[in-house]
Amino acid sequence: MATPLASALRCFAVAALLATSCSTTPTLKRLECSGSIRRSVVFDSQSGQLYSYFPDLSVYRPTPELRFSVQTTSSLRDGSLVIETRVGEFSGEGDAVTWAAVEPPVGHTTTINLSSLKETVVALTGRPGVQFPDRHGLCRWAPLQTQTIESS
């Protein structure tokens, strides 16, 4: 007959096993931004957790309590669709978490004239392989310095 303590420990071990098997490996992205105080930002694209690179160890480590995100808003202004993308960070404790854009602003504003949109779509029809540059305003994706990630 199992004691209550043994049963509790067994349940805890099963719960810990399930929790670790459900955790995913971070998918790090490196964003280099010009015109910013930050030279580059490395973050997990799944959770938004910031990472720092340690060249002596050639490893990325999570930066405690910092969250990075890209926020996109859209609006209609004077017959145009305006899409604004800004880089920001979450801060705060508990339920009082706020998002603020980094300063100086990093991101891009795209304006699409809705009256000429039809003409633009027609002009691009029949041209396979039209590709847009892999950049986000003043930012661009950059390769990581290493693939080694140290968990927290």
Where are these regions (language model features)?
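Beta-turn initiation residues at beta-strand->coil junctions
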Residues: 35, 121-125
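Residue-level signal for mature regions of secreted extracellular proteins and peptides
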Residues: 15, 26, 132-133
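Bacterial N-terminal signal peptides that target proteins for export
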Residues: 1-12
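Edge beta-strand at a domain terminus
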Residues: 125-152
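Short, solvent-exposed loop/hinge segments that bridge or flank secondary-structure elements
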Residues: 28, 32-71, 81, 95-112
